[in-house]
Structures are given as C-alpha cells and as structure tokens.
A protein has these predicted regions:
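Exposed, flexible binding/inhibitory loops of compact, secreted disulfide-stabilized domains
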Residues: 1-70
Length: 70
C-alpha cells in the first residue's frame, strides 16, 4: 500500500531529535504529507493515509520511533 504514496516514506534519522524539528523536516522533505506530533503511548486510528506521518514523541518531546507515512 505504501508503494502508492509519493515521496519519501520514512525518516529513521529523526529518532532522538525534538518532535518539532522532525515535523518541520518531514514536511520539507515530503510536501505531500502532514506531520502530526503525538505522544508515544497514544492510540490512533488504523486507517492508512499517504498524506499523514505520525511523529511519536516521549515525555520530553523527543522522537521515540521511526516516523513513517501512514
């Protein structure tokens, strides 16, 4: 399914950086997506979307897992 999406699909290099930095980087590198910062323990919907990247952050606002399109 993700192969149908345009542009960069994942950002492993952003694990460990501040969520706001990751959000801006993702949107700059793939203008087709909207990056959304969410707490790492939050439960989101399971619908796959090519225009969304969830940026999961820990309690300190640091990216805790690889942001991916979906």
């Amino acid at each position: 399914m993700s192969s149908d999406c345009q542009g960069k699909q994942s950002w492993p290099e952003l694990v460990g950086v501040r969520g706001e930095v990751a959000e801006a980087t993702i949107e700059r590198e793939n203008p087709a997506v909207n990056a959304v910062i969410v707490p790492e323990r939050s439960i989101g919907d399971t619908q796959f979307r090519c225009d969304r990247v969830r940026v999961r952050v820990d309690d300190n606002g640091i990216v805790s897992s690889v942001p991916r399109v979906g």
